Structures are given as structure tokens and as C-alpha cells.
A protein has these predicted regions:
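Acidic, Pro/Ser/Gly/Ala-rich intrinsically disordered segments
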Residues: 1-4, 100, 340
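Flexible, surface-exposed loop/linker segments and immediately adjacent secondary-structure boundaries
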Residues: 69-108, 112-113, 121-293, 297-300, ...
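Single-pass transmembrane signal-anchor helices and their membrane-water interface zones
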Residues: 27-38, 53-79
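C-terminal non-catalytic accessory extensions
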Residues: 283-342
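Short, low-complexity patches enriched in S/T/P/G
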Residues: 44-55
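A short, acidic loop/turn at secondary-structure junctions
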Residues: 2-35
Length: 342
């Protein structure tokens, strides 16, 4: 919490940090999930961080929204969203933002190095706009809540059915699946998405990644999203995935990724099943199966031909284990192979 945070914000954040609440996403969120990640790449081919209380991050952000709601305006014009100044002097278009205001479709909100703002995403959530950020309201429809992040960093929290909130970037689109996340884009159009609640789909062309709670994915202009990796993934795995996703890593990078992967990295290997060349797919499956045993109904033959039901069944097992491992970190010792307490 920085020195610019108003006292009322600090109080609400502190209260929110004491609320132990968490909900696992529903099972039926994932029909046909593998068809949304199996895009062909245009080219073939950080150190671990300390634990953070994942269940509290969205709640702390919700405290900021509570402050906004207390002072929100009455009627908002059609095709516009409410916006609130948090610090400094953000601009909406060319006009300085007062305490509260609106941003209309087509308008840009811009912050400098000392200003911040909060955008209310209709009635389904909010976006915290960090310093040095430029973001535009693209659509304000009930079925399509859409922003475009040109550069900078945002934190988004949405409580709504999947696929109602979108953030376009130069490297693709973040699609909300009931989630909270931080999205950063640099001046080159490259960036990172870090999911702190639920799941996010990041898509560019035919290439898609499903990023769960506690995972990150790098994004690159003209390449789209990289393979998701755990917050504490080994550096060797991150380097191998970067070579596969954004360079011509080839078989050597695949072997490097498989050698570095742990049971906690099953989400990454599951994505690789549909991303590597067919001759390498068996090695990926065998390594994945050794780290997280496949559930009933999952066979090597089905996985190798990218059968929809097979991959979805395996994914449901992998993502539940990852969810339990992340959400209970520091509370229970969860076996990363099975998701059960040890």
C-alpha cells in the first residue's frame, strides 16, 4: 500500500484482508476447452516469488470498489462507464478527471506516473488503472464489456458469467472466465497476465491459453499468449517455454521443458500437448502422466489425437489440483500429484 492511498481506502483494505473467503469455479466452465488452446504458433520453437494470500487479493481490491460505490453517480449515459480518480490527475480524453466522471465509448483514460483511477465495468466489476497507463473504452454493452489496453498496467475484478468482459492488447485479448487478474503491457506491446482469482483465457488468432489462479502467461505482439506457468515455476522451465512460444526452440526446448517440469507444472504440460509437433506429443503425455496420473477415461491414444473429451477430463483433474495447491498454500500440505492433503 503506497503513501497515496487515502485513509478510507487503507481501512477498507485492512478489513478486507481479514476476510477468509474463496469459491472454486464450477465444473461446467470447461466444455471443449482444448479446442480453444490448440492454435498453431506462428513460430516454433523470472525467479520464484514469495507466497501471497491468493484468497485475499480479490477481497482487497473489492474494498476499493466499495469506496467507489459509496460515491457513485446516478444515471450513467448509454455507452459510458463511471470512472473515479484515486490519485493524481488522470485524463479522460484531454480533460482532467474530477473526483468522479464518465468515460464514453471511444475515449481514452490516461494516467501519468503519479495518477491512478478506477473504472466501473458496468455493474459487473471494476478495473484499477495503475500509473503510466493508457486505456480506451471500446464497447459498453450488456453482452460485451470491452477495454483496450495500449500500455501500462491494470487490475481487473469481475463477478459475472464467463465471456462478458474483455481487454484487448497488442498481443491479443484477455477473456474473463469469472476472475481477477493483473495485466501489464509495455511500450513494445508485449506483456504479462497474472491471475489472482478464477481463470482467464488469453487469445490471439487461433492461439489460446487458459491461465488459472496462481499462474502467469507472457504475451508477445505477433505471437499471442505463451504457455501458462506457475508463479514459482523453475527458471529452466520458463526459459524453455519462452523458446517454444516465441522462438524456434524445437525439440531441444521441449526436452528442456519436460526435464524441468514438476507436478505443480502440469498446467503447462497440458497446454503443450496441443502445441508441440505430433512426433513430440507422446513424450509430453508420458511426462505429464508421470507427474499427475491421468484419471479414469483418459488414455494415451485419446490424448495423442487431441480428443476433446479426453483432454477436458484430464484438464478438470489438473486444474482442480492446481486450484487446491494454490488456495491452500501455507494452510494444508497438498500433494501436487493428486490434490489430496498429506
Amino acid at each position: 500500500m503506497d503513501r497515496d492511498t487515502p485513509p478510507e481506502f487503507r481501512e477498507l483494505l485492512e478489513r478486507a484482508a481479514r476476510l477468509p473467503k474463496s469459491i472454486e469455479p464450477p465444473r461446467d466452465l470447461w466444455p471443449g476447452i482444448e479446442t480453444r488452446i490448440a492454435g498453431k504458433r506462428p513460430g516454433k520453437g523470472e525467479t520464484g516469488r514469495e507466497w501471497v494470500p491468493w484468497v485475499l487479493i480479490p477481497l482487497a481490491a473489492a474494498a476499493i470498489l466499495a469506496v467507489v460505490l459509496l460515491g457513485r453517480r446516478g444515471t450513467v449515459p448509454r455507452g459510458a462507464w463511471e470512472v473515479m480518480r484515486v490519485a493524481g490527475l488522470p485524463l479522460v480524453g484531454s480533460s482532467p478527471l474530477e473526483a468522479t466522471g464518465v468515460i464514453r465509448v471511444g475515449e481514452w483514460l490516461e494516467t501519468d506516473d503519479s495518477s491512478r483511477a478506477v473504472i466501473l465495468v458496468g455493474d459487473i466489476g471494476h478495473v484499477e488503472v495503475k500509473p503510466d497507463t493508457r486505456i480506451r473504452l471500446v464497447r459498453a454493452l450488456r453482452s460485451d464489456h470491452r477495454l483496450a489496453l495500449e500500455r501500462g498496467e491494470i487490475y481487473a475484478k469481475v463477478d459475472a458469467p464467463p465471456r462478458l468482459f474483455f481487454v484487448d492488447t497488442p498481443a491479443g485479448t484477455a477473456v474473463d472466465l469469472g476472475c481477477a487478474y493483473t495485466l501489464a503491457v509495455d511500450s513494445s506491446g508485449n506483456g504479462t497476465i497474472h491471475v489472482t482469482g478464477g481463470y482467464v483465457e488469453f487469445a490471439w488468432g487461433g492461439r489460446r491459453s487458459i491461465v488459472p489462479l496462481g499462474f502467469r502467461a507472457d504475451t508477445r505482439r505477433a505471437f499471442g499468449p505463451g504457455t501458462p506457468y506457475a508463479e514459482d515455476a523453475p527458471q529452466a522451465l520458463r526459459q524453455a517455454l519462452a523458446a517454444l512460444d516465441f522462438s524456434s526452440g524445437g525439440p531441444a526446448a521441449v526436452r528442456g521443458a519436460l526435464a524441468a517440469a514438476r507436478s505443480e507444472d502440469a498446467v503447462s504440460l497440458w497446454h503443450l500437448l496441443a502445441r508441440v509437433d505430433p512426433p513430440l506429443r507422446r513424450a509430453v503425455y508420458d511426462r505429464l502422466a508421470s507427474l499427475v496420473p491421468p484419471p479414469a477415461g483418459v488414455t494415451p491414444e485419446g490424448a495423442l489425437r487431441l480428443d476433446r473429451t479426453t483432454l477436458e477430463t484430464y484438464w478438470n483433474t489438473i486444474r482442480r489440483i492446481a486450484w487446491r495447491k494454490t488456495i491452500l498454500q501455507g494452510i494444508r500440505d497438498i500433494d501436487p500429484r493428486t490434490g489430496t492433503a498429506r
